[in-house]
Amino acid sequence: RVLFRSKFEDEDWARLSTGIGHLTGRNIWMVDATDLTLEQIQQTATSHQIAHPETALVVIDYLLLIKIQSTARYDLAVGELSKGLKRLAKTNRTPVLALSQLSRGVESRPNKRPMNSDLKNSGEIEADADIIMMLYRDEVYNPESPAKGIAEINITKQRNGVLGTVYRRFYNGHFLPIDQEEAKSKSAPQQKSQPRRYAKA
């Protein structure tokens, strides 16, 4: 946001310098292009992996920005994208991490932790994914939450493992280590026990 405002303070320059230092020497490649089709993504990823066999992860940000050429129903077209990325991962033997938006239904529930059914056009995405991870921060909905500064990574699907929640400290856009038990107690505080009531005989 500071970059877009073009107003850099000394602290901003220090943060930028630190960030560049973290990225320097790391094998991270970005393709900043719009309206890429699934076929173009597959070709780009495969060509890159041939040139750089050490490639360990492909990230798509985000799924519904991929250009759809099919004239089929939109949900079916999204299914084609999902299956295509699955094929890419298997063919290249490289994990593909695809970000996806949520439907607005989550906003209408008391418990706003996202579920698999909240994924837009979720049927095919949920079926094809090996792992689904949902991010949640209680302070977004409850500013006075005891879990302020804590992010939940909820594993809602794990084809070859267990489901559960991993907690991270969320600071300045970064996920940092945190004591899991402490974070859990703040994120899901135990209900106070109510005194027992006895009926008169």
Regions found by a protein language model. Name each.
Residues 6, 17-21, 61, 108, ...:
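Alpha-helical context
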